[in-house]
Amino acid sequence: MIVASILILIVPVLLSVAMFTLAERTVMASMQRRFGPQVSGISGLLQPFWDGLKLGVKEPVLPDSSSAGAFAASPMISFVLSQVAWVGICISDASFQGLVIMAISSLAVYGVMLAGWASNSKYAFLGCLRSVALMVSYELSLGAALLSIGLFVTDGTGMKCLNFAEMPTTPQYAMLPLCLIFLVCILAETKRDPFDLPEAELVAGYNVEYSSLGFALFFIAEYANMAVMSAIASIYFLGGFSALKITALFFAFVWTRGTLPRYRYDQFMRLGWKAFLPLTLAFFALHASVAI
C-alpha cells in the first residue's frame, strides 16, 4: 500500500517532467526558427525517454578524494525533496499548507550545498556557493510574499484561492506587485534564466562532477520544483489549482529563457536584497496591520 501511494505521487510528476522537457525544447526551437525534437516517436514524444535512457546507461564517475557517501546522497536528497513538496499541495485540508511547502522547498538548498562540498572540486564548490546564495536570497522574498497573501485572504496560512473576480478593485491592485515579485522569485529559486549562473555551463556549476543518474536526478528535481512553484502560483494568484494554468506558467518560464539575457551575480543579488525583500516585507507589515 505504501509503495503504491509513493508510485501514485512520483509517476505523474516524472511524466510531467518528461513532457515539460519536450515542450521546452520544442518551444525554444520555434523561437529560434529551427527544428526541435521530431524523430523519436510522433512529434518527438519519445525523445525525453531516450534522453533518460542515455543518461542511465552512462558510467557513474566518482571523483578522487571526494566524499563518496555525500556525493551519492546529494542528488537523491534534491530528488526526494522535489517529490515530497507535492504532498503539501495534495493535502487540501491542511491548516498550514503554505508553511509546509515552503519548509520542504527550503530544504532543497542542502542538496545543492552538499553536492558542491562533496565533489571536492574548487569549481563545484564556487558554483555551489553562488547557487546557495541565490536560492537563500530570493527564498526570503518568496516566503514573505506567501505569508502576505495568507494574512490577506484568510486568518492563517492555509491555501485559499485568491480569486480576483470576487475581490474589490483596490485589493486587486495591491496583490499585483506581490504576484509579479513571486513569479520572478520562482525563476530565481529554481535557478532558471535570467537567474541562471552563466559559468554553470562551463566548469563552475555545483553539479559539474556528476554524470549518469546523479546528473539526471538533479535535472528531474529542477523541473519538478518548477512544477511545484507553478502549482503554488496557480493556487495563490490564479484562482485555484489547474493543470492548464501550470502549463501556461511553464510556458512563461520557457519564454523568459528564450528572450531575456542573463544577469550577473552582483546584479541579481542586488535585486533580491535591495528591491524585492524590502517590498515584500512592506506588504507583509501592511497586511499584518490590516489583519490585526
From Swiss-Prot:
Q: Which GO terms describe its cellular component?
A: mitochondrial inner membrane
Instruction: State the InterPro entries in the record.
Output: NADH_UbQ_OxRdtase_su1/FPO (IPR001694), NADH_UbQ_OxRdtase_su1_CS (IPR018086)
Single GO MF descriptor: NADH dehydrogenase (ubiquinone) activity
Localization per Swiss-Prot or TrEMBL? Mitochondrion inner membrane
Q: Look up the domain of life of the source.
A: Eukaryota
PANTHER family on file: NADH DEHYDROGENASE SUBUNIT 1, NADH-UBIQUINONE OXIDOREDUCTASE CHAIN 1
Q: Which family does it belong to?
A: Belongs to the complex I subunit 1 family.
Question: Which purpose does this protein serve, as stated in its record?
Answer: Core subunit of the mitochondrial membrane respiratory chain NADH dehydrogenase (Complex I) that is believed to belong to the minimal assembly required for catalysis. Complex I functions in the transfer of electrons from NADH to the respiratory chain. The immediate electron acceptor for the enzyme is believed to be ubiquinone.
Question: What is the protein's name according to its record?
Answer: NADH-ubiquinone oxidoreductase chain 1
What is the native source organism of this protein? Chlamydomonas reinhardtii (Chlamydomonas smithii)
Upper taxonomic lineage? Eukaryota, Viridiplantae, Chlorophyta, core chlorophytes, Chlorophyceae
| Name of encoding gene | ND1
